[in-house]
């Protein structure tokens, strides 16, 4: 940035922090398509914004208002109560089924790897294993 431009701007806006905020807002406005009031001369948007402030081709009050408007937060509006009532009505569909009902399922309906039903509490059959359990215990040094 040209030092002369910044020094000229400090005369117009004595607070350097406010100057930076106003120049940044004007640079954003330029990037958004706002028309330029000075020639670009192959300068970037922040430099053009500072030149506009130094030449007083933009009003400082307009920049302040634009800056304030850009930083204000609009509170979110609450959802209408009708939607809440519908959501609460939908909670009934998620209710837990009765203990004796058919919907709950049973542990005896679970299938093992071969697709056979596993009885609840039944011991697994290890006779089909290739390595005896005693050999596995020796390997792990248990």
UniProtKB/Swiss-Prot annotation:
Name by which UniProt lists this protein: DNA-directed RNA polymerase subunit omega
Record's function text: Promotes RNA polymerase assembly. Latches the N- and C-terminal regions of the beta' subunit thereby facilitating its interaction with the beta and alpha subunits.
UniProt entry keywords in alphabetical sequence: DNA-directed RNA polymerase, Nucleotidyltransferase, Transcription, Transferase
Annotated region (Disordered), positions in chain: 93-142
Superkingdom of the organism of origin: Bacteria
GO cellular component: DNA-directed RNA polymerase complex
Chain's gene name: rpoZ
Lineage of the organism: Bacteria, Pseudomonadati, Pseudomonadota, Alphaproteobacteria, Rhodospirillales
GO biological process, one term: DNA-templated transcription
Catalytic reactions of this protein: RNA(n) + a ribonucleoside 5'-triphosphate = RNA(n+1) + diphosphate
Keyword Glycoprotein in annotation: no
């Amino acid at each position: 940035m040209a030092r002369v431009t910044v020094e000229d701007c400090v005369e117009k806006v004595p607070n350097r922090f406010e100057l930076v905020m106003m120049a940044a807002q004007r640079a954003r406005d330029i990037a958004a398509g706002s028309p330029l009031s000075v020639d670009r001369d192959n300068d970037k948007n922040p430099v053009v914004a500072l030149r506009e402030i130094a030449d007083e081709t933009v009003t400082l009050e307009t920049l302040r208002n634009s800056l304030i408007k850009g930083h204000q937060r609009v509170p979110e509006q609450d959802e209408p109560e009708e939607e809440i009532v519908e959501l609460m009505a939908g909670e009934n569909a998620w209710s837990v089924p009765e203990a004796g009902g058919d919907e709950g399922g049973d542990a005896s309906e679970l299938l093992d790897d071969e697709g056979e039903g596993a009885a609840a509490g039944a011991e697994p059959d290890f006779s089909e294993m290739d390595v005896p359990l005693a050999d596995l215990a020796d390997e792990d040094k248990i």
